[in-house]
A protein has these predicted regions:
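Solvent-exposed serine/threonine-rich low-complexity stretches and specific carbohydrate-binding patches
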Residues: 122-133
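Short proline/glycine- and polar residue-rich coil/turn motifs
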Residues: 7, 131-138
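Short, compositionally stereotyped local motifs that mark structural "simplifiers"
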Residues: 1-77, 96
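Aromatic, loop-rich ligand-recognition surfaces of beta-strand-rich domains
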Residues: 61-124, 139-186
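Short glycine/proline-enriched coil/turn segments at helix->beta-strand junctions
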Residues: 9-11, 87, 130
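Short intrinsically disordered coil segments
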Residues: 45-49, 126-127, 172-174
């Protein structure tokens, strides 16, 4: 390509490298998901927050640079500034479980909404049991929270970690880590 590529909606980009007219390697297929949170500022205690709203979904490896984790998963929070008031139907937060690496979804996740980034109101939440959290395997799932067409500019996600992995876990006593990927707001 010769110019920057401008992406303004959901689409799939395919890239291939050629040398002397011959394809070198595999074609990279990159599905991009566009929603109200895509490319919006992420505020709060997150240094790599941009990957939460970059439109690129993480793989089944939490180390692929598309998953964001925190130093401590006891309680994490971040706020997405939609830059204008919006009608909000739902928030979807991508989570990964990698049992062998103690990567698990949170015990509790809440969504709070504000018009001014000062006064917030809780609009949705979900809690998960240990059986739902500490499932074996490696898989991705989206936690979807209904927002009932709330109006707001700032959307805050607050998650509480599951604590230590249980005695029956492959990593007993180790803190379960939260890994979030794409936050999608409709």
């Amino acid at each position: 390509y010769k110019n920057p590529l401008m992406v303004t909606g959901t689409q799939t980009i395919k890239c291939t490298t050629y040398r002397a007219g011959r394809q070198m390697g595999k074609t990279l297929t990159l599905p991009l998901v566009w929603n109200k949170a895509t490319a919006k500022p992420v505020l709060g205690n997150t240094q790599a927050g941009k990957i939460l709203v970059n439109g690129i979904r993480g793989s089944l490896r939490q180390s692929d640079f598309e998953w964001h984790s925190w130093e401590s998963s006891d309680s994490v929070a971040f706020t997405i500034d939609l830059q204008k008031k919006e009608s909000l139907r739902s928030v979807s937060v991508g989570c990964i479980t990698n049992y062998g690496m103690a990567a698990h979804k949170p015990a509790d996740i809440e969504v709070w909404v504000s018009n001014d980034n000062r006064d917030y109101r809780k609009v949705s939440g979900k809690q998960f049991t240990d059986g739902e959290i500490f499932r074996e395997g490696t898989f991705k799932e989206d936690v979807v929270l209904d927002l009932n067409k709330e109006i707001g500019r700032y959307v805050r996600i607050i998650a509480k970690g599951a604590g230590e992995c249980p005695a029956t876990h492959v990593r007993p006593g180790q803190e379960a880590r939260i890994y979030f990927d794409e936050v999608m707001i409709e």
